[in-house]
Amino acid sequence: MTRSKRIYVLDTNILMHDPTALFKFEEHDVFIPMMVLEELDNGKKGHSESSRNARQVSRFINELIESHGSSDISEGITLIQPKGLNLRAAGTVGKLHFQLKQTEPGKRFGSVLPDNLILGSILQLKEDNPGVPVVLVSKDINLRI
């Protein structure tokens, strides 16, 4: 059975629980909605473990962008593990993608809430990538429903 390439959409709570989650999806691509970046930015203040993890995710993303160079990020950034982080054997790696288009969740979900913005970005991602499985990774049971 061949495994097709998938796109994993990471929710804020996954990254605030484990900042290395970015690098744990092998050859598959990872997508981070704009709302997740905003929630990480809001969550980085403080001394709690989740605040430290939010800051670490930001450092990982910054390092990836800097190593990517000045070329266009719209095609994705190769998910090369940072130095000192040994999570998997060498092999094919996916790319990190960011939400580049604004969605209008009010048209689909009514209220403009963070979860609705994330769901709107997932639906847009599915429309933009027909035939590619898109998987939400979240600890939020209601969001997964």
Task: Indicate where each model-derived feature is located.
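Non-catalytic pre-domain segments flanking phosphatase-related domains
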Residues: 1-5
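Active-site-proximal, substrate-binding regions of enzyme catalytic domains
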Residues: 7-135, 141-145
